[in-house]
Amino acid sequence: MKRNKLTVLIPPTPDNVNASEWWPVKSDVNWIETVYSDNKPAPSKLQGVDVFVGTDFTYEMAEFSDKLKAILIPAAGYERIIADALPNGTVVANASHHEAPIAEWVMMVAVALDHKLLQSHKTFITGLWDHWPGRYGPYRELFNRTFGIIGFGAIGRRVAKLAKAYDMEVIASGRSNNHSQIAQSLGVKYCWGKQGMKEVLSRSDFLLVATPLIPSTLNLIDEQALASMKKTSYLINPARGHIVNEYALYQALKEKKIAGAAIDTWYKYPTEETDQPRPSTYPFWELDNIIMTPHHSGATDGTRNRRAQTVAENIDRLTSGQPLINVIDF
């Protein structure tokens, strides 16, 4: 039986690339390209659309979604999809595939923090030998240290593999005991529940935040959690800014309650109205014990290609009546 051609709403493809090349579908689909503002199309553009490719969905968009079968997120996070706004029968699926570059970023900043790399570069290019051994140091090494991971999904597991390659002890925690077997296969001690998280916080030399932002993880790393960490430890967050309490983190770094941090995900982002905002209410940029990057740890060509492939596969699955992959259970 011949199926109707799907209408798919997408943002404009770059450099005049054909939509079917950017999103490599095998099916014959009707593409509608439109400019997104603050990650969203004009709500009226959803009218008559079967598939919406995007990261945000609002009540206003729902009002025009008369045919919407699926929202395909070309990213991992789904916190900007308002679940209560979804039309009946609309399926939401994401596309992660960013664990490899994020894990590389994590290990890069871990070494950089230990070796005071940014501070050393900043002073040395001005002609100062302030970080020369004998005048500063000694520096530290990853070997034989403890890497703690909060959240043992794809990113956490990838980081665990790399940390083990540095001969580090790796401990991880999650909300349930579901990951015990895979952790054991990777040589990782897995602790679950609140007690497990307490153990990871107190024992880690490096603490990776790798859990999704959902209601139960909002401000998960708060003042109490930061206070339970070693004063010599580092916090690394490529997940979502609001998992770590903004003020508590700033105070912990400013008062040297922890040794430092590397942060890739923030509390404020560019919008149509504010193109270059400061990423936080608090002046993290004035501190000397933080590495700040603009949410780019997973933004590689490989990630983009893998995500596009997953979105395309789900379009093909929807066309042929097969169940989608990576479906979000709200």
Question: PLM features: what roles do these ranges have?
Answer:
Residues 1-51, 171:
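N-terminal glycine-/charge-rich "phosphate-binding" loop or analogous flexible N-terminal tail
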